[in-house]
Regions:
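Cell-wall polysaccharide-cleaving catalytic domain and substrate-binding groove, primarily
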Residues: 1-84, 93-154
Length: 154
C-alpha cells in the first residue's frame, strides 16, 4: 500500500513514540517488538502469521508490533481489513485504520501535526494527553521525529 510522505512520517512518529529510537534499531524496525522490551533486553517475536498475544504481567498488556497493538483487537481488525497476517504491511494498514477512525488523515495531509496527534491520543498511550496512566511523550520531540521522517508541518 502506498502512503503519502506525511502519513509515512506520522507512522514513523507513532513507532518512535511507542517504541523509541534505540529499540527500533535493535529490532525489525519495531514490527517484532513485544511490550516490556528495552534496547538492552528486547522481547521479540519471529512469527508474523498472527498477533503474538504474549502477555507481559509487569505491563498488564499483550501489546505487540511497531504500533503496539493489543491482542484483543487483532481478530476484529484482521477481519475488517482482510489482513493476511501480522506482517509489516498489515501493521501499517491497521495503524492507518486507527488514524482514520480518529479522523486524523486529513489533518496529517494538511500538515496539522499537533491537531493530528491530539486526535489520535485515544489510540496510543504514549501520545501527549492520552491519559492511560503510562508514560506520555511531549509534543516537541514527536514533532521533530515527524519532521526528521520527512513530514511537513503547516
Amino acid at each position: 500500500m502506498k502512503f503519502s510522505d506525511n502519513l509515512k512520517a506520522f507512522l514513523d512518529m507513532i513507532a518512535y513514540s511507542e517504541i523509541g529510537t534505540e529499540l527500533l534499531k535493535v529490532s525489525d524496525n519495531g514490527y517484532d517488538v513485544i511490550v516490556g522490551s528495552t534496547p538492552q533486553n528486547p522481547i521479540l517475536f519471529t512469527n508474523y502469521s498472527e498477533h503474538p498475544r504474549k502477555y507481559q504481567a509487569a505491563q498488564n498488556s499483550d501489546a505487540a508490533g511497531r504500533y503496539q497493538f493489543m491482542g484483543r483487537y487483532w481478530i476484529p481488525y484482521k477481519r475488517q481489513l482482510s489482513l493476511p497476517d501480522f506482517g509489516h504491511e498489515s501493521q501499517d494498514i491497521w495503524a492507518v485504520q486507527l488514524i482514520r477512525e480518529c479522523r486524523a488523515l486529513d489533518l496529517i495531509e494538511k500538515g496539522k501535526f499537533d491537531a493530528a496527534v491530539t486526535a489520535c491520543k485515544s489510540r496510543w498511550a504514549s501520545l501527549p494527553g492520552a491519559g492511560y496512566g503510562q508514560h506520555e511523550n511531549k509534543i516537541e520531540p514527536l514533532r521533530q521525529a515527524y519532521i526528521n521522517a520527512g513530514g511537513v508541518v503547516a
